[in-house]
Amino acid sequence: MTRKLEIPESRDLPDWSHIGGGKVRELYVHRQYKNILLMFASNRVSAFDFVLEPEIPEKGRMLTQMSNWWFRKLPAENHLLENYDQELYRDLASHIPSHILERSTICRKMDIIPFEFVIRGYLTGSAWADYLENNTVYGIKLKGKFRQGDRLPGPIFTPTTKSRTKDTPVRYEDLVNAIGLSHAQQLREMCTDYYTTAEQIARNKGLIIADAKFEFGIAEGKAYLADELLTADSARYWDINSWGQFDLPIERRLDSFDKQAVRDWVKCNSGKNITPQNITPLRLPQELIQTVYKKYKTLLAKLTG
């Protein structure tokens, strides 16, 4: 079955050339300023590296607002053009229709480091599965006994490959071999600092960031935060009050403001193996679409309100 991808009409972006896209975003380069990119966030939703249907209403706009909010909150150099040349940013933005601009990020072109950098502050997801099986979190031995959802003694840095299909964990030693010791150390420190700062900001908003993915680009020999930042697609958020109520069932304590409900539904409806043949025919029920939409909307309001 062929899926029709949501891509802005060329007449709406006459100054930009479409150069590719991923599971959620479409990428454009400016026809005159070849070092300026536009990332358009679609309403598509993916799980286990597959795009599903139907789309989540307003998802692209909400993700863009979350990401831009965090880019402005964190004391970190990033890829946003407005931080580099406000006059050029305002000029380019003024020629983009509002319904596209609200879902777009205008940024500097950079050499993206081909890894994703995940910081885990709480024992959940694949970290919890690893702990149950090996009593470690990605090779790190934990002292004492931990429950699902417990806060870890300190943030754990777990890089992965950056792939169009399935991302796989990367040992720190292999990361060092790929990008060099100094760069690996710098990125680990940056990710840990950004996560720690963001987690405190989120706590003040009544939220916990259980884990988060960061991506970086290189320009003029420096590393900058790139792609999306701490959105509902790239970070796992919990309600801080629910997390602290240990008498609640675990699914309520750790109910997250993201697409975990989609992942759970796919697991239940794709048979024993999650494969393209099993996932492609699936259509998400409207009740689930509305549930995820409300989660994104609630998270955005909690963060920015």
Swiss-Prot record:
InterPro entries the UniProt entry points to: SAICAR_synt/ADE2_N (IPR028923), SAICAR_synthetase_CS (IPR018236)
Entries under PANTHER family matching the protein: PHOSPHORIBOSYLAMINOIMIDAZOLE-SUCCINOCARBOXAMIDE SYNTHASE (PTHR43700:SF1)
Protein name per its UniProtKB record: Phosphoribosylaminoimidazole-succinocarboxamide synthase
Family: Belongs to the SAICAR synthetase family.
Reactions performed catalytically: 5-amino-1-(5-phospho-D-ribosyl)imidazole-4-carboxylate + L-aspartate + ATP = (2S)-2-[5-amino-1-(5-phospho-beta-D-ribosyl)imidazole-4-carboxamido]succinate + ADP + phosphate + 2 H(+)
GO biological process: 'de novo' IMP biosynthetic process
Organism classification: Bacteria, Bacillati, Actinomycetota, Actinomycetes, Micrococcales
Domain of life: Bacteria
Source species: Tropheryma whipplei (strain TW08/27)
A GO cellular component annotation in the UniProt record: cytoplasm
EC number(s) per entry: 6.3.2.6
Pfam families reported for this sequence: SAICAR_synt
